[in-house]
Design a protein with these regions (language model features):
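Outer membrane beta-barrel
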Residues: 84-253, 258, 281-298, 305-316, ...
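N-terminal signal peptide c-region/cleavage motif recognized by signal peptidases
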Residues: 13-15
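Glycine-rich, charged/polar anion/phosphate-binding loops
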Residues: 274-275, 301-306, 343-346
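N-terminal periplasmic/intermembrane-space "pro-region" immediately following the signal or transit peptide
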Residues: 18-107, 113-121, 299-302, 484, ...
Length: 489
């Protein structure tokens, strides 16, 4: 640097000033000072070179060179490759207009369930006649396909699942869970059309592969909105996201558990989540709205429920509302034959860099129409998780739900007079889960085990097939051990 300064000074001195004695003296003095400074720096560099091991210096230079070459080669290779592996299999056109990534999710479970008060002859008698049952299952087996068409802003997603043995589904049948197209307008707006999950509760919106426990809470199973076929609009800002959804109505996931009878005995609010006829009876109108506020941190931190060691603190708040009216038959009847359904959800999540927490509440109001029955379902859930080693995490979770309402034991007349009204309150249903996660390769390869204790009776309204928590008697305090090995890419 000093030598360069001298050269610059010599170039910049005009020849016309060469005869000026004072100017030449100043230049000579500055050159002498720079020569002394340059000599001192060279001496210091020579001393440092003599103190350094020549072989070590050669190896360091070679390693740095190889690392740079490898990085350059990887960048060039990824730019040129049209097929290969990059955290998943991918295909792409040479011009970059088309891409396809192939992924999969496999969840293999061992279940042991102890029920001291089974309800014999109800549900599956092979299960209910035994206090202790155990076995293995593939809870989820999904093939995931995603990518873009024509330009990166036009995204697509396909989720092909294999059904497990559940009520109303053929075991081992391949079916479409999600199939949608989305377009990002690059001006804070995004639109999605197709079949997809309704963005209502954070627990349901977070993928099953990114949960803390083996399965979601009974509260979520009772009150989440499932999937719809329709359109979704998303408005995003650095700290706020607003999502509006409309379409063929929410698909009540609890219909397989028993709530379906209370929600819609006439199928008024219960559209199937599978591909359905556009003109089939479903809803007269449906709307769902969710607002999320990022208080601090980044949005990507809330793509799962965990907060690894060393990650930054973050917090997010979410608020959701939903309403829909079932489609009437237009056939003259003495009573209203369409059902109505409204729900509300709120949640707040924290990440502390090595630990995480979430508190959520949900509420649902159902007017089932034909019997003029009205029901209120509500509950809360709370969870906390903490790492004790970089890849090991323990967690605790509790959820509680209750249903109360009124129904007519005898129907009123066509003018609404008469009839006998009965009021009832359903017993509380609560589950405490204690568990551990071992992240062998993040969520891509993960082992999860939890032990679940039902605090009170698990009745026909709140049991969950996929959670392996079954209906039991009044004195039933179940203990369910679930251990899951997950492969995801």
């Amino acid at each position: 640097m000093k030598i360069a300064n001298v050269a610059l000074a010599l170039v910049c001195v005009p020849v016309s000033y060469a005869q000026d004695g004072d100017a030449l003296d100043e230049i000579r003095a500055e050159m002498a000072r720079l020569r002394e400074e340059n000599a001192r720096i060279r001496g210091e560099l020579d001393r440092m070179n003599r103190a350094r091991d020549p072989e070590l210096d050669r190896l360091m230079r070679a390693q740095i060179g190889m690392a740079v070459d490898a990085a350059m080669a990887q960048v060039q290779s990824e730019q040129q490759m049209t097929a290969g592996w990059n955290d998943g299999f991918f295909l792409a056109s040479e011009d970059g207009k088309f891409s396809m990534e192939l992924g999969a999710l496999v969840q293999f479970r061992f279940i042991h369930a102890h029920r001291p008060d089974p309800l014999r002859a109800l549900q599956d008698p092979d299960i209910n006649n035994w206090e202790n049952r155990w076995g293995f299952e593939f809870a989820r087996t999904d093939l995931l396909v995603r990518g873009h068409l024509y330009r990166p802003e036009l995204q697509y997603f396909l989720n092909l699942g294999i059904t497990r043995e559940e009520p109303g589904l053929v075991n081992g049948l391949g079916f479409v869970k999600d199939l949608w197209l989305s377009y990002d307008f690059q001006n804070d707006w995004r639109v999605r059309v197709g079949q997809f999950k309704i963005h209502h509760s954070r627990e349901e919106s977070t993928p099953s592969s990114a949960q803390l426990a083996v399965e979601r809470t009974l509260l979520n199973e009772a009150l989440n909105l499932g999937r719809t076929q329709g359109i979704e609009l998303t408005w995003s800002r650095p700290r706020d996201v607003l999502t509006f959804t409309t379409g063929d109505g929410a698909s009540d996931p609890s219909s397989d558990n028993g709530l379906g009878f209370y929600v819609a005995p006439n199928d008024g609010t219960l559209p199937s989540m599978l591909n359905r006829n556009a003109l089939k009876r479903d809803v007269e109108w449906f709307a769902a709205l969710r607002w999320e506020r990022l208080m601090y941190g980044s949005w990507s931190q809330f793509s799962d429920m965990t907060s690894p060691m060393g990650s930054a603190p973050a917090a997010m708040f979410g608020l959701s509302i939903h309403g829909q009216k079932g489609e009437a038959t237009k056939v003259p009847t003495p009573n209203r034959d369409e059902s109505r359904w409204a729900s509300f959800a709120a949640d707040i999540s924290w990440e502390f860099g090595g630990s995480s927490a979430m508190l959520a509440g949900m509420y649902g109001y159902i007017d089932s129409g034909g019997f003029q029955d009205q029901y209120h379902i509500y509950g809360i859930s709370a969870q906390y998780a903490r790492y004790w080693a970089p890849k090991w995490e323990w967690f605790a979770r509790y959820d509680w739900a209750e249903l109360y309402g009124q129904n007519y034991t005898t129907e009123p007349d066509s003018t609404g007079n008469g009839g006998t009204v009965g009021y009832f309150a359903q017993a509380d249903s609560g589950v405490l889960a204690l568990g551990v996660n071992h992240y062998m390769d993040g969520h891509n390869f993960k082992w999860t085990t939890d032990l679940n204790f039902t605090i009170d009776q698990t009745d026909v309204l709140f049991f969950s097939n996929v959670a392996s928590i079954s209906q039991d008697g009044e004195d039933g305090q179940q203990v369910v051990l679930r251990s899951q090995l997950q492969l995801s890419f």
